[in-house]
Amino acid sequence: MEKQYRVVIIGFSHMHINDVAAHFYENPRTDLVAGADTIPLVPELKEGTFTRKWNLEFCRTNFKIPKIYEDYREMLDQEKPDLAVITCENAQHLEVMYECAVRGVNVSIEKPMAADLSMAMEMIRISNTYGVKMFVNWPVTWRPELHLMKDLLDEGKIGRILEFKIRVSHTGPLGDGAKHPGVKITAEPGGIKANAAEAPCWISAAMAL
């Protein structure tokens, strides 16, 4: 019999959790057993669509999350999950990932992985130290056409990369039509520009700056 995986959500500041949670809810081998928000670095000044309160209630209602905790550390201790989905502010990724790792909980981290390279390297060190699996929810690298392009480039079959140009149409970290004062402070650094730079670094095998 295949193992059933217990999954918890930590952080509801990122609007992508509404899509990510749907995938775990629909997967027959994963159970969304609980969720908990983190304490915001900057309190939200407005209620509305794609705020953290709205995201939490949307996920709780639509994906039948049975328990919501005030403290994510208590949730980790009580629920003993196999996997924690981390969708808090970018600046809190390291802290939350560490609390999961010391408890032996594997993590899925919403892109971008970290606010800067030093934070990312520390997260890798923690993952190795505590023997937990860590992956970044970065769908662009799962697309077969991009893997084919990278393979052809690595094999020298379609020339040499000279320059990357990226055009991004993006509504920001909250979602279409949602504008909430203060969100930029907790979303940066490591926002959409850092996220866009990851694909060229991966394709060209260059180290991120």
Spans of features found by a protein language model:
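Rossmann-like NAD(P)(H) cofactor-binding subdomain of soluble oxidoreductases
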Residues: 92, 112, 136-142
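ADP-ribose/adenylate-binding Rossmann-like module
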Residues: 103-116
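Glycine-rich phosphate-binding loop at the start of an alpha helix
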Residues: 94-95, 117, 143
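N-terminal glycine-/serine-/threonine-rich beta1-alpha1-beta2 phosphate-ribose binding loop
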Residues: 1-103, 121, 125-130
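Predominantly a Rossmann-like dinucleotide-binding segment in NAD(P)-dependent oxidoreductases
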Residues: 15, 140-209
